[in-house]
Amino acid sequence: MKLLPKLPTLQHLTKDNPMPIATFPIGPLDTNCHVVYTERDALVVDPGGDIDGGLQDVLDFIARKELSVKAVLLTHLHFDHIYGVAPLKERFPSVPVFASAGDLPLLSTSLASGEKWGLPPVRPFTPATIAEGPCMFGSIHGEIRFTPGHTPGGLSFWMPQEHAVITGDSLFYRSIGRTDLPGGHLPALTEAIISKLFTLPDDTDVYPGHGPNTRIGDEKRLNPFVRPAKKDPASR
């Protein structure tokens, strides 16, 4: 039986939703690659698969919408979030790639991590560093919030007008990122979630690095890993 391709989840471009988000689960670990877009511009977040691993679907979407890619934003530098950066840069050579300075020491290890999964090494690239605070990528605007703990330089991208935040592997539906990998730190992660994410409005939609979307208010009430009795999940 032939399997149907995975379809992206989409928000629709409307007057009340000027910066929708298309989500594509791609790559060996089904990383959510998020495309934030307006009528003309696009921001690609965490391209975790190569051309054969789902990135082509992202490229086809960008072409179909006739979007101009303004930047690639990496929430952190684990291999499953950066696998498609080099092929994306081949298609859009002038597009900058941004990551937190705190994660740069992980890059060399991450480039080789695919071999542990029987995959070719991640092709090298050189990211520019991005600061915490308001930022613009063409007509796309939001705020970088540093959310370390899963990695030393993890970051999230908050879009206040859209009531949405892209959290990478910091916060998931009813879970948080694992902290047993090199550079992980559970107290830092829970503190970042509480101070940088749980301070957002309760109706903020959460677009995580893996799995389904959720909302800040729901995670504040129901997430079992951000409570006084904290434990470290090993699922991601």
Model-found features: residue ranges?
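Conserved Rossmann-like nucleotide-binding pocket used by diverse enzymes
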Residues: 22, 73, 143
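Active-site HxH/HxHxD metal-binding segment of metal-dependent hydrolases
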Residues: 50-55, 59-138, 221-229
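Short Gly/Pro-enriched turn/cap motifs at secondary-structure boundaries
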Residues: 24-26, 125-127, 146-148
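Conserved beta-strand hairpin/beta-sheet module of binuclear metal-dependent hydrolase folds
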Residues: 14-65, 156-168
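Short Pro/Gly-enriched beta-strand edge/turn motifs at strand-loop
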Residues: 14-20, 114-117, 139-140
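Metallo-beta-lactamase
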Residues: 42, 49-50, 113, 141-146, ...
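N-terminal amphipathic/basic-hydrophobic helices that include classical n-h-c signal peptides
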Residues: 1-18
